[in-house]
Regions:
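The catalytic Nudix box helix
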Residues: 150-185, 199, 203
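N-terminal strand-loop-strand
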Residues: 108-151, 155, 177-178, 201-203
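Active-site-adjacent beta-strand/loop module that shapes the phosphate/pyrophosphate-binding cleft
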Residues: 187-210
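Short glycine/proline-enriched turns and hinge-like loops at secondary-structure junctions
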Residues: 105, 122-123, 150, 193-194, ...
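Nudix hydrolase/Nudix homology domain
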Residues: 1-90, 145-149, 191, 212-249
């Protein structure tokens, strides 16, 4: 659904300022929740605002932030969306049921009744580039709208190291063993409350694939010059594929 009030300009997006909203929203300064600062520009969360005479602004879906410009506002928008979801899900204490409040010092929700403290939800997940010489394993998801090739990926389980997550996900999804697990880089992915961590690893043994058809529609080995991929500014998966294709890893 629609979620964020935006102004769309020829050169990108913009958010409303307090001066745009204050005439129609008398308590906006008391109700605004500070989110974060980017290059000395402060961002706040304001809900249930009146926008009767704000014809230049529209309510937009979170997907608008995938390709919006400038990138720092797109990042601010989707990160604010993630925090808004977390605040909505933490209005009341899960331990005693009393109302929670924003802590004055930390990004945290606090229950004054029982002392419970809740921090933002961040789910660790891995993206895995399984390689075998000059070949990389690429897959397509089963039953999802996204139909392009991707790398293997999955969430970390409780009690598991990140390296164990890599080994388990590869075994579960394609039935292969891997070795020489190497960290590449990370990326926050606020669309799903996730912190993505990219790894490359080498095939350990035979390359015959045993596909988990509930998770994947297919999985194939591609040589560097055969890899089907196009540049994408916001995808760690895409970046890892291109790095391998160009012989940089």
């Amino acid at each position: 659904g629609q979620s964020t009030l935006l102004k769309k300009r020829k050169d990108g997006i913009d958010f409303p300022r307090f001066r745009d909203l204050e005439r129609l929203n008398e308590e906006i300064y008391e109700e605004a929740v500070y989110l974060f600062t980017i290059d000395e520009e402060r961002f706040y969360l304001v809900q249930n605002i009146s926008r009767e005479r704000l014809s230049e602004f529209t309510m937009e879906n979170k997907e608008s932030f995938r390709y919006a410009e400038p990138q720092y506002l797109a990042f601010a928008g989707i990160t604010g969306y993630q925090l808004n979801n977390w605040y909505r899900n933490r209005k009341f204490c899960g331990r005693c049921g009393h109302k929670m409040r924003h802590d004055e010092k930390e990004r945290m929700m606090r229950c004054d009744h029982c002392g419970n403290m809740e921090f933002p939800k961040i789910c660790p997940a891995v993206i895995i580039g399984v390689t075998d010489g000059d070949k990389i394993l690429m897959s397509k998801y089963a039953g999802r709208a996204y139909k392009k090739y991707a790398l293997l990926a999955g969430f970390t389980e409780i009690g598991e190291t990140i390296e164990e997550t890599v080994q388990r996900e590869v075994m579960e999804e394609v039935g292969l063993k891997v070795k020489n697990i190497r960290y590449y880089k990370s990326q926050p992915w606020s669309f799903s409350d996730t912190l993505l961590m990219g790894f490359y690893c080498d095939l350990d043994g035979e390359e015959e694939i045993t596909l988990d058809r509930e998770e994947l529609a297919l999985a194939e080995w591609f040589r560097r010059d055969e890899i089907p991929v196009e540049p994408s500014r916001d995808s760690l998966t895409n970046e890892m594929i291109i790095k391998f294709k160009n012989g940089e890893v």
